[in-house]
């Protein structure tokens, strides 16, 4: 029995990367600048554009059945949802985001305890309050509407809690990271009632499997070739494969067909070696998913 899954697509910085990930996983999501309701080529899905900061509360309520948001915002809102899986991707890289405690470069602060009685500015107010309360460090945490880094530079606060991937922008602005408070990646979350529904759970699990397989395929390619049977062992030693390469004997021949999956960046290094070992008909092909 089929049904309809209400799915939240994160609006903002994760939006384009999420749509592209779904495309690689097999779904075409089309977003219009005039609508908050993206089209999707799946009659069993209804998509809505929702800010990651609000995704957790809507999933918890059951307004939507499932969606993608940063784990940081799920924790910020203390959302009571099912975390189905995590997926490491962002608008610019494939690395986790970090929420860091930041001060000016010449600040005397070296650790969180040095901020006793200080004022901290951040978008992540709830988490930051809990972080310092758990360590019995009295601070005042203020919500920042933006330009958070400028506030500590201008002396409007003593420190900030800000999100970064590399820390390069923080350093470029004359600031210093005291420590990391939390690492965050996008997570697929589900409403508990939806997760208890057999059809919706299977649909959500299918989405999770295909999204993860699309991420797993990034930077990977397939390589196949024909080679003399007596060079098989030498060639398989050269090939960096997820598992052992697939080998098939060619009909009425002392040659074999070899197929392997490997990082794309390795191809330029190993192809000359394969040719020296007698490989012929080498074909490289892209991968959309590795399941």
From Swiss-Prot:
Feedback inhibited by histidine. It is found in: Cytoplasm. Its EC number is 2.4.2.17. It holds the Pfam family HisG. GO terms for biological process: L-histidine biosynthetic process. Its cofactor is Mg(2+). Its main location: cytoplasm. InterPro entries: ATP-PRT_HisG_long, ATP_PRibTrfase_cat, ATP_PRibTrfase_HisG, HisG_C, N-reg_PII-like_a/b, N-reg_PII/ATP_PRibTrfase_C. It catalyses: 1-(5-phospho-beta-D-ribosyl)-ATP + diphosphate = 5-phospho-alpha-D-ribose 1-diphosphate + ATP. One of its GO terms (molecular function) is ATP binding. Signal peptide: none annotated. It comes from the Bacteria. It is an enzyme of class 2 (transferase). GO terms for cellular component: cytoplasm. Pathway: Amino-acid biosynthesis; L-histidine biosynthesis; L-histidine from 5-phospho-alpha-D-ribose 1-diphosphate: step 1/9. Keywords: Amino-acid biosynthesis, ATP-binding, Cytoplasm, Glycosyltransferase, Histidine biosynthesis, Magnesium, Metal-binding, Nucleotide-binding, Transferase. Catalyzes the condensation of ATP and 5-phosphoribose 1-diphosphate to form N'-(5'-phosphoribosyl)-ATP (PR-ATP). Has a crucial role in the pathway because the rate of histidine biosynthesis seems to be controlled primarily by regulation of HisG enzymatic activity. Belongs to the ATP phosphoribosyltransferase family. Long subfamily. This is ATP phosphoribosyltransferase 1. It comes from Geobacter sulfurreducens (strain ATCC 51573 / DSM 12127 / PCA). The lineage of its organism: Bacteria, Pseudomonadati, Thermodesulfobacteriota, Desulfuromonadia, Geobacterales.
């Amino acid at each position: 029995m089929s049904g309809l899954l209400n799915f939240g697509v994160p609006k903002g910085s994760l939006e384009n990367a999420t749509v592209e990930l779904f495309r690689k996983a097999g779904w075409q999501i089309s977003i219009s600048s005039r609508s908050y309701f993206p089209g999707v080529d799946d009659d069993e899905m209804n998509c809505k554009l929702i800010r990651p900061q609000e995704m957790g509360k809507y999933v918890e309520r059951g307004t939507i059945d499932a969606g993608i948001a940063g784990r940081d915002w799920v924790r910020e809102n203390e959302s009571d949802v099912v975390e189905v899986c995590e997926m490491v991707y962002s608008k610019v890289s494939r690395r986790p985001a970090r929420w860091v405690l930041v001060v000016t470069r010449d600040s005397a602060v070296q650790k969180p305890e040095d901020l006793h009685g200080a004022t901290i500015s951040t978008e992540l107010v709830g988490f930051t309050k809990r972080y310092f309360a758990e360590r019995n460090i009295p601070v005042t945490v203020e919500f920042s509407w933006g330009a958070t880094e400028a506030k500590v530079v201008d002396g409007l606060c003593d420190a900030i809690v800000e999100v970064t991937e590399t820390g390069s922008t923080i350093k470029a602005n004359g600031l210093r990271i005291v420590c990391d408070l939390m690492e965050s990646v996008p997570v697929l979350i589900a409403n508990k009632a939806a997760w208890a529904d057999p059809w919706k759970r299977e649909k959500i699990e299918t989405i999770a499997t295909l999204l993860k397989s699309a991420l797993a395929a990034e930077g990977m390619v397939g390589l196949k070739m024909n080679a003399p049977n007596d060079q098989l062992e030498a060639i398989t030693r050269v090939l960096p494969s997820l598992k052992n390469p697939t080998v098939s004997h060619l009909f009425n021949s002392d040659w074999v067909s070899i197929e392997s999956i490997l990082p794309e960046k390795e191809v330029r290094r190993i192809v000359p070696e394969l040719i020296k070992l007698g490989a012929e008909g080498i074909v490289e092909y892209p991968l959309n998913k590795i399941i």
